[in-house]
């Protein structure tokens, strides 16, 4: 018998490259939410920042990493690009009428290759999307980035991860912030390229996100709407 607070809910998950490849969160998080009795619609797009989900935005990252969609029990539909892009948040809400929207975004706005975090730009990205949330009000949660490995092709570094996580925690309202850094230890997740994780890492991350969503603060409030 399913006793989860998420049971019977419709959940829309929107994210960056962590949701754009089979085996990543579009597999693990999606599966975990379904196990709890939710109907789940997941959308991922490589290299897209938050504001890119406010209006249709063409793919920025070169193939083979493009977009991916998973509509509840349907198989994952991967489009490697370049002729693909985002579906706006407002359109997705109208299409799926979710009880809860989950954003998984942070790495694309951390600008790891830049000498400093572009705080004003990142703030603008986030608030552009949260403004759209207020126009199409649905209870939402925002999942911040998890620890990575310093270096690699994306130049991810954990000092910057902590910086962008702090900025997100102060900026994502009305969404509830889920701080991945507090949910999973560095030793529990391994990034093979500095930013993206092996199968065990995505499984662990999907589990802790699902557990955080299955709480009175998130799922409970979503059901009250």
Where do the language-model regions lie?
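Extracytoplasmic/secreted envelope proteins and their assembly/folding machinery
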Residues: 26, 30, 86, 90, ...
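Active-site segments of SGNH/GDSL-like serine hydrolases
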Residues: 102-112, 129-162
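Hydrophobic alpha-helical targeting segments used for export or membrane insertion
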Residues: 1-10
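Catalytic His-Asp segment of secreted/periplasmic serine-dependent ester chemistry enzymes
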Residues: 146-225
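Sec-exported extracytoplasmic/periplasmic mature domains
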Residues: 19, 23, 30-38, 94, ...
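Conserved SGNH/GDSL esterase-like catalytic core that processes O-acyl groups on lipids
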Residues: 11-14, 18-116
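Extracytoplasmic/secreted cell-surface and envelope-processing proteins
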Residues: 21-24, 51, 110-115, 119, ...
């Amino acid at each position: 018998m399913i006793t989860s607070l998420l049971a019977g809910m419709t959940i829309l998950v929107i994210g960056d490259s962590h949701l754009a490849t089979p085996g990543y969160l579009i597999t693990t998080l999606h599966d975990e939410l379904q196990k709890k009795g939710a109907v789940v619609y997941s959308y991922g797009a490589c290299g897209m920042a938050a504001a890119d989900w406010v209006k249709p935005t063409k793919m920025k990252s070169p193939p083979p990493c493009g977009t991916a969609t998973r509509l509840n029990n349907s198989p994952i539909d991967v489009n490697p690009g370049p002729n693909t892009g985002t579906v706006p948040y407002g359109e997705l809400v109208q299409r799926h009428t979710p009880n809860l929207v989950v954003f998984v975004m942070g790495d694309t706005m951390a600008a790891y290759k830049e000498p400093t975090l572009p705080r004003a730009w990142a703030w603008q990205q986030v608030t552009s999307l949260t403004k759209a949330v207020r126009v199409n009000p649905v209870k939402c949660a925002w999942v911040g980035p998890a620890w990575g490995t310093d270096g690699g092709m994306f130049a991810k570094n954990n000092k910057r991860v902590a910086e962008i996580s702090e900025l997100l925690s102060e900026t994502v309202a009305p969404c509830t912030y889920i701080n991945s850094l507090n949910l999973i230890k560095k030793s529990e997740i391994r990034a093979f390229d500095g930013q993206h994780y092996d199968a065990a890492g995505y499984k662990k991350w999907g589990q802790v996100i699902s557990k955080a969503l299955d709480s009175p603060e998130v799922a409970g409030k979503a059901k009250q709407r």
